[in-house]
């Protein structure tokens, strides 16, 4: 496990949560956070089941294993969201419910469908698609030479930007932010990042960083953090078709690669990220992501009923309640179901063939 990346999950999931609490004034948080998790997924999956094990990787067993980790919580949060709707007299059509149950909602170009019930769950539909094509995509990307990779990447970026500029602004959110065949670019970047991470040049870089003083490593860490801050500052001035995804195709890989490389260094930021509290918070990042929208609805409704009008205090309560609930949800629901499934052989303990 790369401890720094594990803890960064919490940092970036909180950017997503804050974007949903603040609204359009902080769209950066949501789009940056989603890009991070898509790219990180490609990188971590490649790291875990990379070239040595490629020929023995079982897509079916792996997807089954991952579904048991997140699908029960997806159904639970959707049920809670539907119950909240029912209290308001809102009863959705089956045409909106079924795609979410089947995890294909992000393939349907309607906000009423892909943001249905527990809105953040659209992310799962994309991730499942990435898991299904991982083995093939990994093989293709790793057989390409460096020159082929550079040429193909340059052509892809040019085509993406040209076509993106032609998309009406009201369709950008779906076609460039949600649509799985487009967001697979982020996932592929994660796979390519794995190639760079496993290269001899990275080994040399890691060896050099290990000889640096903690103060020098801390300076480099703060420079990378500053890169994220700078990106946030220029974000509002960038065209929607760029800032929704492609804006992060450089900065997020830099963050992932850098912190993966210095995972065991003595820098201040690394020490913070590898601390026990941050590791614990990193372990509940998925649960935070899945429940925060439902918690937000419940807390806001309660605040309205008791006459609390301060948006700041409401946001603080939402964050604290979400984090507090995420721990028992993980321990007593997500992990418990997964462990029971392992005992009864509903999943393969070893996903390799």
Sequence positions of predicted segments:
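Interfacial loop-to-helix transition and helix-capping segments at the boundaries
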Residues: 2-3, 24-34, 112-126, 166-189, ...
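Transmembrane alpha-helical segments and their boundary/interface "anchor" motifs
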Residues: 9, 34, 38, 50-85, ...
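Aromatic-anchored segments of alpha-helical transmembrane domains
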Residues: 14-21, 104-108, 154-166, 222-235, ...
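Membrane-interface helix/loop caps of multi-pass membrane proteins
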Residues: 17, 61, 96-135, 176-179, ...
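Structural signal for the C-terminal ends of transmembrane alpha-helices
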Residues: 46-53, 84-87, 136-144, 193-202, ...
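Membrane-interfacial, low-structure loops and terminal tails that flank and connect transmembrane helices
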Residues: 60-61, 200-214, 268-274, 341-353
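Hydrophobic alpha-helical segments with transmembrane-like composition
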Residues: 105-161, 198, 329
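Alpha-helical transmembrane segments of multi-pass integral membrane proteins
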Residues: 187, 191, 215-336
């Amino acid at each position: 496990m790369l401890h720094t990346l594990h803890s960064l999950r919490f940092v970036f999931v909180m950017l997503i949560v804050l974007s949903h609490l603040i609204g359009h004034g902080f769209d950066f948080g949501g789009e940056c956070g989603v890009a991070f998790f898509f790219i990180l997924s490609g990188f971590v999956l490649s790291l875990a089941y990379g070239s040595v094990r490629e020929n023995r990787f079982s897509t079916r067993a792996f997807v089954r294993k991952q579904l048991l980790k997140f699908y029960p919580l997806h159904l639970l949060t959707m049920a809670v969201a539907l119950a909240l709707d029912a209290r308001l007299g809102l009863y959705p059509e089956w045409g909106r419910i079924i795609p979410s149950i089947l995890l294909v909602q992000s393939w349907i170009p309607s906000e009423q469908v892909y943001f249905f019930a527990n809105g953040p769950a659209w992310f799962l539909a994309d991730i499942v698609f990435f898991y299904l094509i991982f083995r093939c995509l990994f093989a293709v990307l790793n057989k390409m030479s460096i020159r082929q990779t550079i040429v193909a990447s340059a052509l892809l970026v040019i085509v993406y930007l040209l076509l993106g500029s032609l998309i009406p602004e009201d369709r950008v959110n779906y076609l460039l932010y949600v649509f799985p065949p487009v967001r697979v670019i982020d996932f592929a970047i994660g796979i390519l990042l794995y190639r760079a991470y496993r290269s001899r040049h990275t080994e040399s870089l890691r060896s050099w960083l290990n000889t640096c003083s903690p103060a020098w490593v801390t300076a480099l860490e703060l420079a990378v953090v500053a890169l994220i801050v700078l990106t946030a500052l220029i974000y509002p001035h960038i065209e929607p078709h760029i800032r929704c995804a492609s804006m992060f195709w450089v900065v997020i890989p830099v963050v992932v690669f850098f912190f993966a490389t210095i995972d065991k260094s003595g820098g201040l930021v690394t020490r913070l990220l590898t601390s026990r509290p941050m590791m614990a918070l990193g372990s509940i990042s998925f649960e935070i992501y899945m429940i925060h929208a439902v918690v937000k609805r419940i807390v806001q409704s309660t605040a309205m009923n008791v006459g609390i009008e301060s948006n700041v205090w409401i946001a603080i309560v939402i964050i604290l309640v979400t984090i507090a609930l995420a721990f028992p949800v993980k321990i007593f629901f997500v992990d418990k179901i997964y462990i029971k499934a392992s005992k009864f052989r509903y999943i393969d303990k070893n996903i390799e063939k």
